[in-house]
Amino acid sequence: RGTAVKVDNELPLADAAIFGCAVMTGVGAVLNTARIRAGDTVACVGLGGVGLNGLLGAKLAGAEKIIAVDVNDDKLGLARQLGATHTVNAKDKDHVEQIKDITAGGVDYAFEFAGSVAATETCYKSIKMGGQVIIAGLAPSTSLFSFSPPDIVTSEKAIRGSYMGSCVPVRDIPRYIELYRQGKLAVDKLINKSIGFGEVNDGFDKLTDGLVIRQILEPHIT
């Protein structure tokens, strides 16, 4: 009961469903864990449902530069529509250098939303002196990320974890829903389609292949 949040009947259930994980984790990582301020520079690495919500959170907070990073050009295009000021394809060998060039040395905050060691490495290399890496993606439990202790000392970098966006559901979900209603958090643009039980396996395949952001499972659909 501590994590059950009542929503009123005016909010469509299909819209409400996305707030339970993707919105909390992405927006929360930016607003709660990092607590970015207006004028900060941000890189969102990994543009699934969580990463794109992180981008929306950065826009809401007034970040000066929001750099969207992914290997999928379609997702980079969507990121621009949602408010990214710059996009970088992580397939480019010089993608870290591109991020540094955009920000004259590195971002204040780099958010790892992809759940991979490679994305974490991109984040670490892309932050400026005194910058922070916020890891919100869940890599496989056997994954290891290595860094140079002298480098993290002399550069005063920080690496932090963010579990479910450091959210308290009964506090944060109503707040995010209200922002959505005010048109400040366009989470509905992340929903590709509704599917029925017969499409579940295909839906998971599309999610794995990066062909969709979020799908809503509606049992009555045949």
Please provide the spans of the model-predicted regions.
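Mid-domain Rossmann-like dinucleotide-binding core that forms the NAD(H)/NADP(H) cofactor-binding site
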Residues: G2-T3, D8-K93, E97-Q98
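Hydrophobic alpha-helical segments typical of transmembrane helices
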Residues: T25, G54, K75, H95, ...
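Glycine-rich cofactor phosphate-binding loops and adjacent beta1-alpha1 units
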Residues: A34-R37, V50, V71, G77-A158, ...
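C-terminal hydrophobic helical "lid"/dimerization subdomain
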Residues: Y109, E121-K125, V170-T222
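Structural detector of well-ordered beta-strand residues that form the stable sheet scaffold
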Residues: A43, I67, Q132-I134, R160, ...
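Conserved beta-strand scaffold positions in the cores of enzyme catalytic domains, especially
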Residues: A4, T87, I159-G161, L190, ...
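Rossmann-fold dehydrogenase core element
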Residues: G131-I134, F147-K189
